[in-house]
UniProtKB/Swiss-Prot annotation:
Chief location: cytoplasm
Enzyme class at the top of the EC tree: lyase
InterPro entries for the chain: Chorismate--pyruvate_lyase (IPR007440), Chorismate_lyase_/UTRA_dom_sf (IPR028978)
Protein source organism: Pseudoalteromonas translucida (strain TAC 125)
Residues reported to bind substrate: 76, 113, 171
SS bond list: none
Protein name: Probable chorismate pyruvate-lyase
Cellular localisation: Cytoplasm
Similarity comment text for this entry: Belongs to the UbiC family.
Amino acid sequence: MITFPVSLSADWQCASLFSDLSSAEQEWLFEPHSLTAKLKSRSQCFSVKVLSEQEFELSAEQQQLLGCTQTTALNREVLLLCDNKPVVYAQSWLPASVNAANNKLHNMGERPLGDVIFQDPQLTRTDIEIARFNTQHSLQQLVAQLKLPSQSLLGRRSLFSLKDYKFLVCEVFLPGAYLY
């Protein structure tokens, strides 16, 4: 049984420190635009499966990244599926906001976050950070539950801002994803 939120505790590093990545890995990990749009372009049928959407405590690292004093945030965990095959596990951390304009990011159901945020011209993004998740990482419990082969995985994360509202998005490419 998987406990949410799935831990993505790892040695997140700036992309420049990953010199051993293949061209396919670089293409997918450093995609500056919507990963959702890129996945849609590579598949006949794209869908989102919500695994969990609930409020959780922020870690000290997450609070620091978000630059907030709040201790909780909405955590949304989804699978991005291409042709009914899970290819990306995504996790977003959305602090509560007093600004009603940002409520569109809460209660999205199976709508892809990328379809919403990349339509906003005020969206900004920090540099992408990369992490490796070895076969002993707790993320492998999800991989096993999905009946996918265990292998070292690559993930990326970025801090996004819409006006003054900051939120964190982490994406891990599952076994069989296009970048492997």
